[in-house]
């Protein structure tokens, strides 16, 4: 008997997630003979539900929530020998993972388009004990770029990136950082560190195809507004690695430390202070989505 567990964060979708409960259950019942729904009430509920689904060998877990809820679910299924397939309905603010997978950002559309015959294996990152499906970062520039609205990008193009960058530079500072990997190290000043599990950033392809179990590490060495603005044209051209202000390393095992107390971020949510050890778990989770064309 095919079984699926639906996990819903009730605060998702502008706190209207439960309005979609019946529709999501009916969608799952088109494919699975048994569907059980769990509603989160507090932090880590999604992890515990996902652990149960893995332990009971459910065929799939379908989660309705933002990146934080999705990463809780990934944490729950990854800690087990059996990993159910994963469905994601975007219900958060950033929804970085579903955007990466090109899942419809409209809730009704995402449910309608959920195809349980179509899957895509993705890499997962683990930073200490925190999981992420897209990006680990230190510094405010990633948030500035993520927060550019699609409508603004369409209307104003590069100007929108520039305005958000100038806003972020006001609070930035350079810190001493040490990045250690199996493919090289970086020791020196930096204003931002990004660890990407994909070849895309801010909707732009900046690396070659990246389904190889490696993370792309970008270190912005200068906090000045001129350095940040110089990155934008290269980002839009998909050639950010060539920028003189960027240090680039590709690796699977990463340790980041600093002599300052620096906070990190995973998929838009606050994470541990440094030091952090990151491992890339290659092709770890099978997600219901169409394969992304490179």
From Swiss-Prot:
Binding site for Mg(2+): 212, 214
Database matches in SMART domains: DAGKc
Keywords: ATP-binding, Kinase, Lipid biosynthesis, Lipid metabolism, Magnesium, Metal-binding, Nucleotide-binding, Phospholipid biosynthesis, Phospholipid metabolism, Transferase
Annotated DAGKc domain residues: 1-131
Cofactor binding note of this UniProt entry: Binds 1 Mg(2+) ion per subunit. This ion appears to have a structural role and is required for catalytic activity.
Cellular compartments per GO CC: plasma membrane
Essential cofactor(s): Mg(2+)
UniProt-annotated binding residues for ATP: 9-13, 40, 66-72, 93
Enzyme Commission code(s) on record: 2.7.1.-
Pfam families tied to this protein: DAGK_cat (PF00781), YegS_C (PF19279)
Single GO biological process annotation from the record: phospholipid biosynthetic process
InterPro entries xref list: ATP-NAD_kinase_N (IPR017438), Diacylglycerol/lipid_kinase (IPR005218), Diacylglycerol_kinase_cat_dom (IPR001206), Lipid_Phosphate_FormReg (IPR050187), NAD/diacylglycerol_kinase_sf (IPR016064), YegS/DAGK_C (IPR045540)
Residues the record marks as active site: 269
GO molecular function: ATP binding; ATP-dependent diacylglycerol kinase activity; metal ion binding
Role of this protein: May catalyze the ATP-dependent phosphorylation of lipids other than diacylglycerol (DAG). In fact, is not able to exhibit diacylglycerol kinase activity in vitro.
NCBIfam families, per the entry: YegS/Rv2252/BmrU family lipid kinase
Entry's family note: Belongs to the diacylglycerol/lipid kinase family.
PANTHER family, sorted: LIPID KINASE YEGS, SPHINGOSINE KINASE
Protein name: Putative lipid kinase SP_1045
